[in-house]
């Protein structure tokens, strides 16, 4: 039998399910690679449509601090996860891909990540 080497959960700062349902725990324990689909929530994280205002505000604050756009911060959030998810972006525009690639140079602190999770959930972490 061939081992499973990848999984493709929906994961974004707006969809945190893999943090809570054991998906990323399994990836860490088995070496399986998570391929995060819809990392920008179908473009909603870029536009702000239908996203908690607190989350958009924090993404915007971090984007100013890091000199990138909101979507790039959202990708940086994914890259900050210890399970090392690979975001699957839906654009084919070279300029957009270049902008999102800047996420590899964004330095989100643990506090930034926790604050993003809290803003996404609308509740404080313990």
State where each predicted segment sits.
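Beta/alpha (TIM)-barrel catalytic core signal, keyed to glycine-rich beta->alpha loops juxtaposed to Asp/Glu
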Residues: 1-125
